[in-house]
C-alpha cells in the first residue's frame, strides 16, 4: 500500500525521478521481487533451501538502500533531482527495505520450524555469522544487484 501511495504522490505532484534514479530503483525492485518469491516458496513449500537464500539477499537489499540514499543526495547536490522527489524516494526505499525485512522474518520462521527452534533472532544471527554458504550467496547477490558505476564528476 505504501509503495502505491508513493506512486500516486509522484503522479499527483507531477514529480519524476531522474533516469539514474529510475535505473537504481529497477535494480532494487528486481531484488525485492526475488526475495518475495524466495520467501513465498519457502513458506508455502516449507522449503529450507529457499529460506536460506533470503537472508543474504536481505542484507544486499539493506546495502542497496543505503547506497541509493547516498546517490540521491549527490544527485540533489548536482541539481539532477528535487528535494520534493527526494522525500518520496526516501519513503519508497524504506518501504521496499521493510518488505525485505518481512521476507527475512518469514524465512527465519521456516528455518526455525524445520529445526524445532523458536528463537528467530538467534537463527538469523547464526546464519549471518557462521555459514560459508551465506557469504557465497551474499557475494553472488551483490554482483547480481550491483548499481551502475557513477559517472566521474
Where are these regions (language model features)?
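Cytosolic, long alpha-helical scaffolding segments
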Residues: 1-153
